[in-house]
Design a protein with these regions (language model features):
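Conserved, well-structured interaction surfaces
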Residues: 61-62, 69, 97-171, 192-203, ...
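Sec-dependent bacterial lipoprotein signal peptides
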Residues: 2-34
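Long, intrinsically disordered, low-complexity segments
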Residues: 36, 232, 343-346, 419, ...
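Aromatic-residue-lined binding/catalytic grooves and analogous aromatic/hydrophobic interfacial grooves
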Residues: 37-39, 173-177, 202, 206-210, ...
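Membrane-proximal, proline-rich intrinsically disordered regions
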Residues: 36-83, 572-604
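Flexible, polar/acidic helix-loop-strand segments at domain edges
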Residues: 362-425, 468-470
């Protein structure tokens, strides 16, 4: 009898017995999530093997959700590796040695650092491989239709691709395993699976994802998509075009990267202007009648009137409850964690300084300095996103707040629920700006800066404009796709382009634009300056979310190692930890030499 393997978290057993309801709940955060009532109409305990498991669409859906249940266990490693190794997050005095070594870039194979362990990533990959084989068999045996197969194939393939990208970013060279295997330790057998370098891996991943038959979201009328217990699943699954955009960005195929990101930015375009606010606001970083996600003050010059709660203003990007309608304007890929179901939400333990928190990681002085260096439109001298991304701002023990705004240590200390936001509108806009800036079109960097600053309409309206005819301004249509934005707002006759509400990253943050210095006249010099602006704004906007190390590494690899090395040096040299300060210069030299990757240590 064949084994069921990773699909149901059994890696070496020939036959397993599982509590079916409990498994579904653990894998899907309470999969009453599925609208199919027959999903729960199953005997409480059921013995399964591969041949008996893949019988119908319900089985296929449970297998897909099992993949995501396993992937959710990677949240802690993902955030820690992508932030602690970079410049915006550092260990506290409460941190364990593994976190300190990551931050100090002193990880060695013999230490068995739990965060530098590739095995959890490969558990997800091998789960994907098993499910992909099972789905193919179901298709061949006519147990699911071709459309059902294509949708689930492409989704699981995208999860596997995303995991491989993370492995490549952190370990540099990794085994590329694309088939089901008996033992997870076979992964580390070079005669079976030779290692690919990061760029070789990316080429493989691009080719694989380009072969996928279905890049759209799941149709809304199938069992996988719905909601239960307050958790909406429409943003739960990986955005395949966003993933392809990331791969193209790494590969240096900037036009294709921009095309993929632009598709997300145009999520509501097919609805047409008749859809009203949804058409103008979804994924466009737009102002609206209530400025739901803007940095806002109740009183213009009263610093204490800053909107700082879970349902108003910029902080609500992270604090809004699941399924709240305006969240669809900004959330691209989000996973929700519930205290009643596995896996456990790890970020209360890592970041909170109360209740069940262990306060192991905190904002670095580097990011605090960056926020404090900004001046808002009302002349308040800090970036409000600093307060709105943290807790205990201005104290000796600031906390990373983006993951813990829904945690209440006083009333419900054991209720550790939260969300893992892997992609949102702002991160897509910033990556689009990075891709556009690398294109060779004349003046294209101005578009990138418009996305960063106050929006397209402001950037492409001449300073001396005073008329009513906006036909030839407030747009970038001359660039052609994927850089053709129409932000025109005219009244004679009335006209509203789909991007007329666009306000830019800094515009939404209530910050004035940062303009290109007059002494920068060369094209390449302008591109580097604009790229540095993108890097800085990414820090201010996306701090702690898991984007930092990939961005710095990507740009360092194509431009100059100092992009990464100088920023990590800045973090370490400003630390209150003497060991970190003492290591700063050595770490800079290490990163300048191209020594960027963790040891691929496999503990058997």
């Amino acid at each position: 009898m064949q084994k069921l393997t990773r699909i149901l978290k059994a890696q070496s057993m020939k036959m397993i017995s599982i509590p079916f309801k409990k498994y579904i709940a653990a894998a899907t955060i309470s999969v009453g999530l599925f609208s199919c009532s027959d999903m729960l109409d199953v005997e409480p305990t059921l013995e399964l093997d591969k041949d008996r498991y893949y019988q119908n669409q319900l089985d296929a859906d449970v297998a897909v959700m099992g993949v995501y249940g396993e992937m959710m266990k990677l949240a802690e490693q993902y955030v820690v590796l992508n932030e602690v190794r970079a410049d915006l997050m550092e260990p506290t005095m409460m941190a364990d040695a593994d976190l300190v070594d990551l931050s100090n870039h002193s990880v060695v194979a013999s230490d068995n650092n739990k965060y530098a362990d590739p095995k959890p990533f490969y558990r997800v990959i091998l789960n994907c491989n098993d499910v992909l084989e099972g789905l193919e068999r179901m298709r061949d045996e006519n147990r699911i239709t071709e459309d059902q197969y294509n949708q689930r194939l492409s989704d699981v393939a995208a999860v596997r691709t995303w995991v491989y990208l993370q492995l490549g970013i952190h370990f540099g060279e990794v085994p590329y395993v694309t088939k089901s295997i008996e033992s997870i330790d076979d992964v580390n057998n070079p005669s079976l699976f030779p290692k690919l370098s990061l760029m070789e891996l990316i080429d493989e991943l691009v080719e694989y994802m380009e072969s996928m038959p279905y890049l759209d979201a799941y149709p809304s009328n199938i069992g996988l998509v719905g909601s239960s217990a307050g958790y909406d699943l429409s943003t739960y699954f990986v955005n395949k075009r966003g993933l392809l955009g990331d791969l193209y960005l790494w590969q240096g195929n900037y036009i294709k990267a921009a095309e993929m990101f632009r598709t997300i930015m145009e999520s509501s375009t097919s609805m047409g202007p008749g859809a009203g606010a949804v058409y103008y606001d979804r994924m466009r970083l737009s102002w609206s009648s209530s400025n739901y996600f803007n940095v806002r003050y109740g009183k213009e010059n009263d610093i204490n009137s800053l909107f700082n709660d879970n349902i108003n203003g910029w902080r609500s990007i992270f604090g809004r409850p699941a399924g709240e309608r305006y969240s669809y304007d900004v959330w691209v890929w989000v996973m929700h964690y519930d205290s009643d179901f596995a896996p456990e939400y790890p970020f209360i333990r890592l970041f909170a300084n109360e209740g069940e928190g262990e306060y192991q990681l905190k904002p670095s002085q580097s990011i605090l300095d960056k926020w404090n260096s900004q001046t808002q439109w009302n002349n308040v001298e800090f970036d409000a996103r600093g307060i709105l991304s943290t807790k205990n701002w201005g104290t000796m023990e600031p906390e990373v707040g983006k993951f813990t705004f829904n945690y209440n240590a006083m009333s419900t200390p054991l209720q550790k629920e939260g969300k893992w936001i892997l992609e949102r509108a702002a991160s897509v806009h910033l990556k689009f700006a990075e891709a556009a800036n690398m294109d060779n079109l004349d003046g294209i960097s101005q578009l990138s800066r418009a996305l960063i600053n106050e929006g397209i309409r402001e950037a492409f309206t001449p300073d001396d404009f005073s008329g009513d005819d906006v036909t030839d301004i407030q747009n970038t249509l001359e660039y052609g796709a994927p850089y053709d934005f129409d932000a025109r707002q005219g009244d004679f006759p009335t006209y509203r382009g789909p991007w007329y509400r666009h306000q830019g990253i800094r515009g939404r943050a209530y910050l004035p634009p940062i303009t290109l210095p007059e002494d920068i006249t060369g094209v390449q010099e302008e591109k580097y300056w604009t790229e540095d602006l993108i890097i800085q704004e990414s820090a201010l906007e996306l701090a702690f979310e898991g984007h930092r190390w990939p961005q710095l590494l990507r740009i360092a690899m194509r431009r100059d190692p100092s992009v990464l090395a100088d920023r990590v040096y800045d973090k370490l040299s400003k630390s209150k930890n003497a060991e970190a300060v003492g290591r700063a210069a050595g770490v800079r030299s290490k990163l300048m030499s191209g020594d960027w990757f963790l040891p691929f240590h496999w503990e058997e």
